[in-house]
Amino acid sequence: MDKRISIAIDGPAAAGKSTVAKVVAKQLSYVYIDTGAMYRTLTYAALEQNIDIENEEKLMEVLQSIRIEFQQGKDTQQVFLNGQDVSEVIRTPDVTNRVSIVAKHRLVREEMVRRQQELAAQGGVVMDGRDIGTHVLPNAEVKIFMLASVEERAERRHLENMRKGFSSNLEQLKKEIAQRDKLDSEREVSPLKKAEDAFELDTTSLSIEEVVRNIMAIVSEALQK
């Protein structure tokens, strides 16, 4: 199995993309690239500098001045901002509730896509996000579009928040996730949408193991081609 392909996993907020993508990458010994973490890191950096996240020009100045890197830790992938581990702080509700605003800016997305394509150039990657199959890796050999109900996604995010010790309100999360869906699907630049050649996977009633099994079956088929 020497062939190394690119795998694009897209879907709305809290659909379980990152969790599944990490497992798939590990099973294949591929590199996992969390594009959402890149936007989160920029959001965190902008908030730290009190930058108005509606101001694209200011955001671009921040983006050009920062280095975002990934390192594979023992069990998880770590995200570094200018050499500092920000894996946990970019997952706080503060960042989560603002990242869609940062991600809607055209110039920001263009620069992020350039960086993401650079990271994926060698193949052997699993990349997840909102526009991977449609925009970042349009030629990916495997494209997955993960779906789940707002209720299910809010429940997952709620449990994740509780586990991390963040305060969490399930009803509030439902509203926030629905709002992020709206922002992500209606933005002018690379909106969230399923690529025509993507496999759609509704994960509402599936366990992580079942989702991974489904994806690995699709990958195995692609590797035979």
Curated annotation (Swiss-Prot):
The keyword Hydrolase does not apply. The keyword Coiled coil does not apply. GO terms for biological process: nucleobase-containing small molecule interconversion; pyrimidine nucleotide metabolic process. One of its GO terms (molecular function) is ATP binding. GO terms for cellular component: cytosol. It holds the Pfam family Cytidylate_kin. ATP binds at residues 11-19. This is Cytidylate kinase.
